[in-house]
From Swiss-Prot:
This is Transcription factor MYB101. Present mostly in flowers, siliques and floral shoot tips. Expression is restricted to the subapical pith cells of both vegetative and flowering plants and to the hypocotyl hook. Expressed in pollen grains and pollen tube. Mostly expressed in mature pollen grains, and, to a lower extent, in inflorescences and siliques. Residues 43-67, 95-118 bind DNA. Keywords: Activator, DNA-binding, Nucleus, Repeat, Transcription, Transcription regulation. Transmembrane segments: none annotated. Transcription activator. Binds to 5'-CAACTGTC-3' and/or 5'-TAACAAA-3' motif in target gene promoter (e.g. alpha-amylase) to promote their expression. Positive regulator of abscisic acid (ABA) responses leading to growth arrest during seed germination. Promotes the expression of aleurone-related genes (e.g. CP1, CP, GASA1, BXL1 and BXL2) in seeds. Together with MYB33 and MYB65, promotes the programmed cell death (PCD) leading to vacuolation of protein storage vacuoles (PSVs) in the aleurone layers during seed germination. Maybe involved in the regulation of leaves lamina morphogenesis. GO terms for cellular component: nucleus; pollen tube. It comes from Arabidopsis thaliana (Mouse-ear cress). One of its GO terms (biological process) is pollen sperm cell differentiation. Its main location: nucleus. It is found in: Nucleus.
Length: 490
C-alpha cells in the first residue's frame, strides 16, 4: 500500500488484517459517507480515516462499479449495444475509452457484455458485426493502412490499351522526359495509396485508378558519358508476354536510323580495335534509379536486344567505307557482323589479329615477312651487281607495290630467289652441309650461304674462315659462330 496512511495501514494489517470477499451493507455505508465528506481520490487513506478494513483498490472499484450516484444498472439498451459495436469496430478492446462514451456504464460491464455477445454469436455461426458495420470498418481501416492485395491488375487489357506506351526521347529533350516521368508518377513512392474518394465512400469499390496499373519507368543514359547512346525509352510495368513486344529491338533500330543522321558530324575517328571489342561493344544501357524499388534485373534488356552503336545507320568513315544497315530484321548481332565485314573489306582492320587461337600462326607469318623484307634489302644493297644480270628480278623487287611482302606467296618468293641466285663453281665443304642440316629444323633460318658467305662482285659466295683449333671441335665452333652472327629479326 502507498499513500499518507501507509504506516498505519501496515500496522493495522499486521494486527487485525484486511478483509476480503464480498462487501456488506455496513461497509458500503461507511465508504459512501467517506466519499461524501472527502470526495473521490486518495483511496489508500480510507482505512486510516474511516477505519474500514479494505484496501484502497477494493474501495475504488466498489465505488466506481456499485456505489456512485450516476451508475446505471441493468442490461444494455439497444442504442447502447449499437454504440458498443460501433466503438469496438473502431477502437478494438479499449474498454476504458468506450466507457467514457457511455455515461453511467463501467468498463467492466462493457467488457463482460462484449465477451458474452461474441461467444454467443460464434456458437450460432453469426457474424460478429452487422453487414453495414463491416463495410464501414473496412473503409476506416483503408484510411490507416492500404491492403496491397486490393490491387487488381487487368493483364488482359494491357495489350489493348497500352500497345503504344513505349516512348523514345532524344538527348536534346532529356529534361522534358524527366518532367513527364515525374508527372506520371506523382503518387508517393513510399506506399501505394488508393483514391481518397474511393476509400471514404462505402458504396464504391476500392479499385485503384488505371494509371496505378501502369507505372512508367524511365531508362536513360548520361549524354556526357557516352554520346553514342543518346536515347531513352520507357518500359511499362507489365506481364512477361507483353514485355517482349515492348522491348522489340526492331523498334529501337528504327529509332536509331531516324535520329543518327544528326549525330554523324560529332563522331570520333574509329581507332584500330579487335573484332572482339567490335562485337561486344563498349555501349551499355545504364538504368536510372527506380522510384518504386524494383530490381534492376526486371528491366534489364537481354544480350541480343541491346542497342547497337550510333554508326549503324550507314555512316561514312574517314577512308570512305560505307557501313550499310542490316538488310533483314534478324537482330543486332547480325548488324554488327555486317559492319565488321565492311570495315575489314575497307582496310580498317587489315593487320588485326582475328582470334587468340590464331595468334601464334599470325606471329610466325609476320616473322617470315620481316625476314624476307630484310633479305630483300640485303640483296638490293650488297648484291646489286648480281641482280643486275637479271633485270626482271631487279625490277620485280623494286616496285612500289612490293614494299611489304604478303604471306600467301612466301614459298614462291624463296623458291625464285634460290633459282635465280648465281651458282658457285667452288664445291661446298662437308662442314657447311652438316651445319645446314642441323639448322633445317627452324623455319626462320635462311639459306646459310646467303647470310654467312661473303658476297663478291662476281657473284661468288665464299664460306667464312674458321681459325684452326686443336682442342675445340670445329663443328661446335662453327655452330656457335653461325648463331652468333645471325641478324636481329625484331
Amino acid at each position: 500500500m502507498d499513500g499518507g496512511g501507509e504506516t498505519t495501514a501496515t500496522a493495522t494489517m499486521e494486527g487485525r488484517g484486511l478483509k476480503k470477499g464480498p462487501w456488506t451493507t455496513t461497509e458500503d455505508a461507511i465508504l459512501t459517507e467517506y466519499v461524501r465528506k472527502h470526495g473521490e481520490g486518495n483511496w489508500n487513506a480510507v482505512q486510516k480515516n474511516s477505519g474500514l478494513l479494505r484496501c484502497g483498490k477494493s474501495c475504488r472499484l466498489r465505488w466506481a462499479n456499485h456505489l456512485r450516484p450516476n451508475l446505471k444498472k441493468g442490461s444494455f439498451t439497444p442504442d447502447e449495444e449499437k454504440i458498443i459495436i460501433d466503438l469496438h469496430a473502431k477502437l478494438g478492446n479499449k474498454w476504458a475509452r468506450m466507457a467514457s462514451q457511455l455515461p453511467g456504464r463501467t468498463d467492466n460491464e462493457i467488457k463482460n457484455y462484449w465477451n458474452t455477445r461474441m461467444k454467443r454469436r460464434q456458437r450460432a455461426g453469426l457474424p460478429l458485426y452487422p453487414h453495414e458495420i463491416q463495410h464501414q470498418g473496412i473503409d476506416i481501416d483503408d484510411e490507416f493502412e492500404f491492403d496491397l492485395t486490393s490491387f487488381q491488375f487487368q493483364n488482359q487489357d494491357l495489350d489493348h490499351n497500352h500497345q503504344n506506351m513505349i516512348q523514345y526521347t532524344n538527348s536534346s529533350n532529356t529534361s522534358s522526359s524527366s518532367s513527364s516521368f515525374s508527372s506520371s508518377s506523382s503518387q508517393p513512392s513510399k506506399r501505394l495509396r488508393p483514391d481518397p474518394l474511393v476509400s471514404t465512400n462505402p458504396g464504391l469499390n476500392p479499385i485503384p485508378d488505371s494509371s496505378m496499373d501502369f507505372q512508367m519507368f524511365s531508362l536513360y543514359n548520361n549524354s556526357l558519358e557516352n554520346d553514342n547512346n543518346q536515347f531513352g525509352f520507357s518500359v511499362p510495368l507489365s506481364s512477361s508476354s507483353s514485355s517482349n513486344e515492348v522491348c522489340n529491338p526492331n523498334h529501337i533500330l528504327e529509332y536509331i536510323s531516324e535520329n543518327s543522321d544528326t549525330r554523324n558530324t560529332n563522331k570520333k575517328d574509329i581507332d584500330a580495335m579487335s573484332y572482339s571489342s567490335l562485337l561486344m561493344g563498349d555501349l551499355e544501357i545504364r538504368s536510372s534509379s527506380f522510384p518504386l524499388g524494383l530490381d534492376n534485373s526486371v528491366l534489364e534488356l537481354p544480350s541480343n536486344q541491346r542497342p547497337t552503336h550510333s554508326f549503324s545507320s550507314s555512316p561514312i568513315i574517314d577512308n570512305g567505307v560505307h557501313l550499310e544497315p542490316p538488310s533483314g530484321n534478324s537482330g543486332l548481332l547480325d548488324a554488327l557482323l555486317e559492319e565488321s565485314q565492311a570495315l575489314s573489306r575497307g582496310g580498317l582492320f587489315k593487320d588485326v589479329r582475328v582470334s587468340s587461337s590464331d595468334l601464334c600462326e599470325v606471329q610466325d607469318k609476320r616473322v617470315k615477312m620481316d625476314f624476307e623484307n630484310l633479305l630483300i634489302d640485303h640483296l638490293n644493297s650488297s648484291n646489286h651487281s648480281s641482280l643486275g644480270a637479271n633485270p626482271n628480278i631487279h625490277n620485280k623487287y623494286n616496285e612500289p607495290t612490293m614494299v611489304k611482302v604478303t604471306v600467301d606467296d612466301d614459298d614462291e618468293l624463296l623458291t625464285s630467289l634460290l633459282n635465280n641466285f648465281p651458282s658457285t663453281t667452288t664445291p661446298l665443304p662437308d662442314w657447311y652441309r652438316v651445319t645446314e642440316m642441323q639448322n633445317e629444323a627452324s623455319y626462320l633460318a635462311p639459306p646459310s650461304g646467303i647470310l654467312m658467305g661473303n658476297h663478291q662482285g662476281n657473284g661468288r659466295v665464299e664460306p667464312p674462315t674458321v681459325p684452326p683449333s686443336s682442342s675445340v671441335d670445329p663443328m661446335a665452333s662453327l655452330g656457335s659462330c653461325y648463331w652468333s652472327n645471325m641478324p636481329s629479326i625484331c
